[in-house]
UniProtKB/Swiss-Prot annotation:
Species of the source: Clostridium novyi (strain NT)
Function: Involved in 'Cys-type' sulfatase maturation under anaerobic conditions. Catalyzes the post-translational modification of cysteine into 3-oxoalanine (also known as C(alpha)-formylglycine (FGly)), by a free radical chemical mechanism initiated via the reductive cleavage of S-adenosyl-L-methionine (SAM).
Cofactor: [4Fe-4S] cluster
Positions contributing to [4Fe-4S] cluster 1 binding: 15, 19, 22
Top EC class for this record: oxidoreductase
Sequence ranges assigned to domain Radical SAM core in this UniProt record: 1-227
Pathway participation: Protein modification; sulfatase oxidation
Keywords: 4Fe-4S, Iron, Iron-sulfur, Metal-binding, Oxidoreductase, S-adenosyl-L-methionine
Active site: 277 (proton acceptor)
Keyword Iron: yes
Binding site for [4Fe-4S] cluster 3: 317, 320, 326, 348
Domain of life of the organism encoding this protein: Bacteria
Cofactor binding summary note: Binds 3 [4Fe-4S] clusters. The first cluster is coordinated with 3 cysteines and an exchangeable S-adenosyl-L-methionine.
Protein name in the entry: Cysteine-type anaerobic sulfatase-maturating enzyme
Amino acid sequence: MKSLSMLIKPASSNCNLRCTYCFYYDICNNREIKSFGMMKLNLLETIVKRAFNEAEQNCTFAFQGGEPTLVGIDFYREFINFVKKYNTRNINVFYSIQTNGTTINEDWAKFFKENNFLVGISLDGTKEIHDKYRLDANKKGSFNKIMTNIKILNRYKVEYNILTVVNKNTSRHIDKIYKFFKKQDFRFLQFIPCLDPINDPRESHPYSLNPKDYETFLNKLFDLWFKDFLDGRFVSIRYFDDLLSILLGNNPKSCCMNGFCSCEFVIESDGSVYPCDFYVLDEYKIGYIEEKTFSELFNSNVTKNFIDSSLNHDVKCKNCNWYPLCRSGCRRNKEPNFPNGTNDNIFCESFKSFFEKNISKLTYVAKTLAYRQH
């Protein structure tokens, strides 16, 4: 494999927070074993060894959870030792970790900096907005702790971005959220739509994001972002970055904008492997990393069926003027009906409205960026 990326869950579904809308909590409650416990070091070594046996040019290790820091910092120190041991061909290696930010201290910050980790911090906005759903086991908010720890990251000059879940509440306060992020000088942002539990009817929870709210959110966020762009302050917002990449003839970074699913090689703490973080379910298990190579896992029938099923887009979808930008969106946003029944993305009308309103401005930004690069 020229490039190999994997998503490792060293603490399985274990987490020190109890976020109301957590999609992985829902996932683990829909499989036979909710938590596989903490990953053993011999399994971690196997993962690293297999990765460098197969990666030819680039290798990316992403850590998520649950809360991946719960496994302890020594686990990651050993991980770096394994990388040094097995990367005998000196291929390019990239590290990232997605954390709720509550456990970060000076040791973690120093480690991230020394080893060039890109850190994703989950933060939903101001204290009032964030603490509505991102609570600990005692139902207390996590905002204050996270903001304190972000200051530690800043002090060590750790590279990080902010990940915000767009739920009903955050979608209606994007002006306040964006203003707050701007005040904190957060320049790299991701906004991901909140997912309803996989077997529940759409929009059946207080936090559920409906298409109209998402449409309003996208339009307001774009207006704020575009104004900053005109004022000479470019903020990286993952979704807008991907749209600009497509307009400039490049590939988006987000898998949901490719028009088909890929295999993310999600590795749970027991070594079981799955094609996607949204489908770490028993029926989507590809196999075990201790028993199969990455190539064998990729060529399995489960992986093939998962990818092939994502290629079935409605004719009306393919004929839509905005298909080249939308590309049908994330498969998970077509549940619970996908792959049988309707194939509509729940946010189809949201995207249509957004593109119709903002395509000329998006094109202007793309052309401006292209001009600056020459």
